[in-house]
Amino acid sequence: MGQKVHPTGIRLGIVKEHTSVWYADGATYADYLLKDLKTREYLQDKLKSASVSRIDIHRPAQTARITIHTARPGIVIGKKGEDVEKLRQDLTKQMGVPVHINIEEIRKPELDAMLVAQSVAQQLERRVMFRRAMKRAVQNAMRIGAKGIKIQVSGRLGGAEIARTEWYREGRVPLHTLRADIDYNTYEAHTTYGVIGVKVWIFKGEVIGGRQEELKPQAPAPRKKAAK
């Protein structure tokens, strides 16, 4: 039976970059790794309502630089920067080194796999029909300019007794093409019937010579004239 490799892991160093960048010897490697994991868990918990997609951690010369990619930067920053300063102080205590926080806004959340998965999961928790939630997310992504998108949900869909998997796809999603920029992420919806897993693949174009194809919104199909 064929198994699928992680779409991001296989592309690291080709079209994807690591979310943690630092050098460590054998004695400190495990310590750095655990601190990174706890830092991400802490930020995801603190910023649940801020639509956080990705957290990058860099450790240059006894400091830490954390970049938070979010669709709602105002919630992260807070009034007059109070919230982000409190985050910085807490993370400095937790990591044991001076921390600098950068915030990057996600301009097109419809093309971010994590944010799309979060949106579908939240709709499932509000008892929206799973097919409607998937179709709406797919149509929004294709309208903004995605080359292809696939969404898969697994679990007791609609409260069914037996769990099953359903998926919906539009456009191309070439998982075997290493130069293809595919954004992949997962999220969980906690419903009254149990946990429903959501997976999202978004194909944004091929990276050729270090340059990505420009994403353009798809033009609407020309209308056919009715026969008289």
UniProtKB/Swiss-Prot annotation:
PROSITE patterns: KH_TYPE_2 (PS50823), RIBOSOMAL_S3 (PS00548). One of its GO terms (cellular component) is cytosolic small ribosomal subunit. It comes from the Bacteria. It holds the Pfam family Ribosomal_S3_C. Residues 39-107 form the KH type-2 domain. Transmembrane segments: none annotated. The keyword RNA-binding applies. Belongs to the universal ribosomal protein uS3 family. Binds the lower part of the 30S subunit head. Binds mRNA in the 70S ribosome, positioning it for translation. PANTHER family: 30S/40S RIBOSOMAL PROTEIN S3, SMALL RIBOSOMAL SUBUNIT PROTEIN US3C. This is Small ribosomal subunit protein uS3. The lineage of its organism: Bacteria, Pseudomonadati, Pseudomonadota, Gammaproteobacteria, Pseudomonadales.
